[in-house]
Amino acid sequence: MRKRNAGIKPSQRFAELRALRQAGKTRASTYESKENEELYDNVSEEEYRKIVRQRLDEDDFVVDDNGAGYVDNGYDEWDQSHYSDEDDENEKGSSGRKRKKSKNVLAEPNQQIGAFFKANAIQPASRIANRKNNEKEDEFMAEILGSIDQDIPERLSTKKGNRSHTTSNAKRRSQKAASSISTTNVVSSDPKKYIPETVPSTPQPASSLPIPSSPPAALETEENVDSQPMELDEPELPVGSDAPIIDVEESIAMKPLMSHDQVDDTASLSKATISQQPLSPMTPLSSELDVSAFSEINSKIKNVDVPASSYSSPISKVSPSDVTEEDGSLFFFWMDYTEMYGSLCLFGKVYDKATKQYVSCFLKVDGIMRSLYFLPRPSSSSVSEDSIAAQTKDVYDEVANLLSKRGVKEWKSRVSKYKYAFELEDVPRTADYLEVIYSYSYPALPTDLTGSSFSHVFGTNTALFEQFVLSRRVMGPCWLKIQQPNFDAVKNASWCRVEIGCSSPQNISVSFEKNEITSKTPPMTVMSLAFRTLINKEQNKQEVVMISARIFENVDIEKGLPANDMPSYSFSLIRPLKQIFPNGFEKLARQHKSSIFCERSEVSLLNNFLNKVRTYDPDVYFGHDFEMCYSVLLSRLKERKIHNWSSIGRLRRSEWPRSFNRSSQQFVEKQIIAGRLMCDLSNDFGRSMIKAQSWSLSEIVLKELDIKRQDINQEKALQSWTDTAHGLLDYLVHCEIDTFFIAAVAFKIQMLQLSKNLTNIAGNSWARTLTGTRAERNEYILLHEFKKNGYIVPDKQQSIRRHAEAFGAEDGLQEESLGKKKDKYKGGLVFEPQKGLYETCILVMDFNSLYPSIIQEYNICFTTVDRSPSNSDSDDQIPDTPSASANQGIFPRLIANLVERRRQIKGLLKDNSATPTQRLQWDIQQQALKLTANSMYGCLGYTKSRFYARPLAVLITYKGREALMNTKELADQMGLQVIYGDTDSVMLNTNVTDKNHALRIGNEFKEKVNERYSKLEIDIDNVYQRMLLHAKKKYAALQLDSQGKPNLDVKGLDMKRREFCTLAKEASKFCLDQILSGELTETVIENIHSYLMDFSEKMRNGKFPANKFIIFNRLGKNPEDYPNGKTMPFVQVALKKKARGENVRVGDVIPFIIAGSDADGHPADRAYSPQEIMNTNSTLVIDYNYYLSHQILPPIERVIAPIEGTNRARLAECLGLDARKYYSHETSESSAFQRYESTLTDDQCFINVSPLLLKCPSCNATSFSLRSVKSLKETLYANTVECDCGYEYSDFTIILQFSSQLRDFINLYYEGILVCDDSSCGNRTRQMSVYGKRCCNKSCRGSVHFEYNDEQLYNQIKFLLKAVQTTTGATRNGIIRCNAINKNISRIMNKNAREFVDMGLIFSS
């Protein structure tokens, strides 16, 4: 940029000064003010807006800018700062003055032009003006360079010149943004203090952006380079730029913008000669991170070049003529919705005929009316046409007055006849209602509103979306036909390519036409995301440091292709995890096969990510733990005040929605993302499709893809691995590979297909189905069915709890989090199991879909069952079943329709001529139909459902118990033994060993049962060769498949629970295999004992990997809310994770490992995350004794319990545990008769006492651990009691230590801690159940007892007295010592009531 008067030569100025001096004048006296030229045109507001519109109509002035942000919005950038010379002068000035800087506030789009000319100048952020002396600065720079690479040569001093002005304004703005980031004292905010002046051996271009297919020309001549020495700037990345991704099979060498020679020849940085030496090789990454594992996977991913369409402007609109039909209508496939100011906003896709692509579309539907139904009060006079008319007139007048008071100016009404069949007792089955409709822009009426002329009003809180789909009969995502679309009604309201307005829902109808456009679901654009965050310890907030995305375009969800067969392209965004990137990282990033964008700050990273989202315009997000990551992302967008933050969804927003509490915060987050579906592998819906323990990404990938994903310690990675260029790149690639894993799992389990089919059946929202709301699906399918048949449907109950659950967890978790609920009615029948080992064939006879079949069998429906108060005297009264002549109810007809549709589809699956795509579609459809039909009963018994009907649920379960009991009686009549039965199945002991013979018996039994019913049907579910039946819902058996091959089938045992580690499950499985092997009992017991001894030896020698010791527990509530959380290991681990800033929420499965020993405290204090244990630098040692006694022994003991020949003490001995601790337990359990205590020896009496310790005051070592009376006597009877260090214990010290230990035991007794005798429960509490000894845990059937009872305390005190009361054989000093101890301890024993027996109290009666 030229300076003013740059054309005047210095010689001319000197001549002018000499002339003035000779004349005796000065320049100030001769200065004349010149009239400046007009810099701006004075125009009116209307003229300025016209100019802006003309600019918008013009083409972009930058062609193919790779999405770098050169988009003209038509307005002048009055409020944006640009680089100028003054910026550098301000930075370099030595003045210590601090300037006040104003914030860079973006102008509102609709501001008047005068608002753009405010005097608030936008200036750079304030900087610290203090300078250090040269010596300190040299030391500081040496430290910085040394931290980057130890082999960089010593810096030579160079003359500092002015900064080059060839950098673009965009780059300067980026530099300012980077310099404004809060930094620590390691790197100063002054750029000159941290930019190295030494030239690296490998020069880096000005941009670390991956090179586009047509790279700009390299600098070749000296005119292109500033002659002044310049400081090295860190390479910048233009926001929003893209680059082609290299195909795996075609490796293309990436060329830098300037070669090494060109830099040496044209860009000399100083007149002084600088010796350049190659940098030392990067430090290899820790061996803990197996780079080859995911590098091999990354090389096999089918990456493609970024298509040219991705470089086009993401906001380009589509012409209306390209999306409409000849008659002016439009086909629109809707996917998601949101509600805004009384209008329904639908998001979906339309077909662009010009590009022959499906593009995103936004449809704003106005004119949807709220429908209210006023029920007139019953008249006491005789019913006549005149009285009915008068009554209706009264209701009309009262409603008109009511609406007028509430500001409703426009409304319509009519009298309509509707039916009602639900739980309000005073609502007649059929009645005339005053139907009132008015716009949703007016406020809603209260739900409990009544009047003098009407008793009820229905529909006051009906949601806008519900009103639309019910009135237009829209059943989930489908093609809609829009008549009279208005393309001018909506402008820039969304981020979609097409925006349409529709004035009335009457212009929208479901399209049943099958043409080229509407014959299938449009292809989707899927973006799979993975995030990495770190904790800002100063602010205690999570910050985003890395985002990786993988884009799959034109995904046909109906074909069900695996991720490997679909082309994709990926990009990653990363910012420095510390102050700067490791030296050489940006060069590695440019050479990486997929695009890596190195951003300078979190702000630029988030801006670039949103720019990518707008460019690719994804329809669906894939993620793992995405709901939590999405919440963090939104918080960072809001915290950093990112412009266009709403583009994470598809609705443009200028203000953040307000949230008042946690539940509404979740609601707000879902509203922001509206328009783009969220598929989360770890939410309720994802978990319902994947059987796993912890639902971690590694476990899911191993189970579904059979690929071992390497878990990494995030904390360690951020601290050490990312210090080197290669380490940071490997860390990034690990995140990048996760995007493929997430997408591959989601595509394999058919997440999109199944959720769409479920939504089409229920008629609700696709996005809501993806959150796992099963209860809402049941509600919507009933709403559609009853509304279609002319019924008034129940209103949705409005309460704080219901609103909190609107976007919360699924039913089971809600119940758990809200507290223990008492049984609402009697459930299914469960027979008492005939425990034991069965060597003959066992048949499992199962009723197919018992409850749906009962609903059809007995015609149970809201419309058929009489639930009036006169017919039900109490809550437990069973309603009568409808008569056989009653018309089929809506509920059974709906279920019959679902069952019949599934039967037809299963018939299609048998067609061998069907294509794989057809078979996949049919299979998904039959799964969706089965899930829907089987879950319909749940809405009747779910108290928070709109269709909750307790009498119907009671009747259905009663008929289920009746059917099971009748089945048992029939088996008894046929001479078959029913060994167990549960709700919808019975187990029959056939007393034969041949499978075919057992099947013949089962078929005969099946025929006799099925002939009793028309809809109920029983069938043979399983044939077990051998079976070990433990308890209710707990058994193991060898299941015979169709070829007669046995497979182990386990239900309810400990090896199926996540609370037991892998080693416990392996040991239990071995024991089960032995028991079910058919060998002799003696051989089985001998093999188990040998295995356990070998198992214990291997564990104590560290032969098992640490990951087999991981225990899982699920959080039922927030970790802070557990009253006994201090004694629960998983709660303590969860609290530690929260303290580190990690995300922990209700429902998470917490993994942990117990380390240390009993001497280190309670197991809860010794619980650590697996990463802490498996860290190569960790000094923690796994507590093998804890695992053997609490994880291995209890499940094995329960497995072997029905087998004779061993006991708990013997099993403990095989595991290397102290068998003496288990003898008393075995005796108390096995025998009702016990010996008198007076007949027991000292060893038998004091087998369970704790040892008494003597700790040396001199060396702090435990000198004596006295475990028996014999050892006590040997120590105390001696002449002196000495420590190994030579310290001699005084009698006073011994008495004090013994007394202190006994007081600890007394305190332990008075704590009154109760423990459950069921080792699988492990409950430990001070709370006592109202049922006495019953365990407080809901799912436990064990009994509680005192952890430390009065007998144990008595024996502990008696243990010491036994040794000191008699002094036979003691030395003189020993006698004195024992007498002193006896005197003090006897005082304690005299206070123990167990010592004395009150004979008078015994014989007083």
Swiss-Prot record:
SUPFAM superfamilies: DNA/RNA polymerases, Ribonuclease H-like. Zn(2+) 2 binds at C1316, C1321, C1335, C1340. It is found in: Nucleus. Residues 176-188 have a biased composition (Polar residues). PROSITE patterns: DNA_POLYMERASE_B (PS00116). The keyword rRNA-binding does not apply. Residues 63-110, 141-241 are annotated as: Disordered. It catalyses: DNA(n) + a 2'-deoxyribonucleoside 5'-triphosphate = DNA(n+1) + diphosphate. Catalytic subunit of the DNA polymerase alpha complex (also known as the alpha DNA polymerase-primase complex) which plays an essential role in the initiation of DNA synthesis. During the S phase of the cell cycle, the DNA polymerase alpha complex (composed of a catalytic subunit pol1, an accessory subunit spb70/pol12 and two primase subunits, the catalytic subunit spp1/pri1 and the regulatory subunit spp2/pri2) is recruited to DNA at the replicative forks. In eukaryotes there are five DNA polymerases: alpha, beta, gamma, delta, and epsilon which are responsible for different reactions of DNA synthesis. Belongs to the DNA polymerase type-B family. Component of the alpha DNA polymerase complex (also known as the alpha DNA polymerase-primase complex) consisting of four subunits: the catalytic subunit pol1, the accessoryy subunit spb70/pol12, and the primase complex subunits spp1/pri1 and spp2/pri2 respectively. Interacts with mcl1 and mcm10. This is DNA polymerase alpha catalytic subunit. The lineage of its organism: Eukaryota, Fungi, Dikarya, Ascomycota, Taphrinomycotina. The gene is pol1.
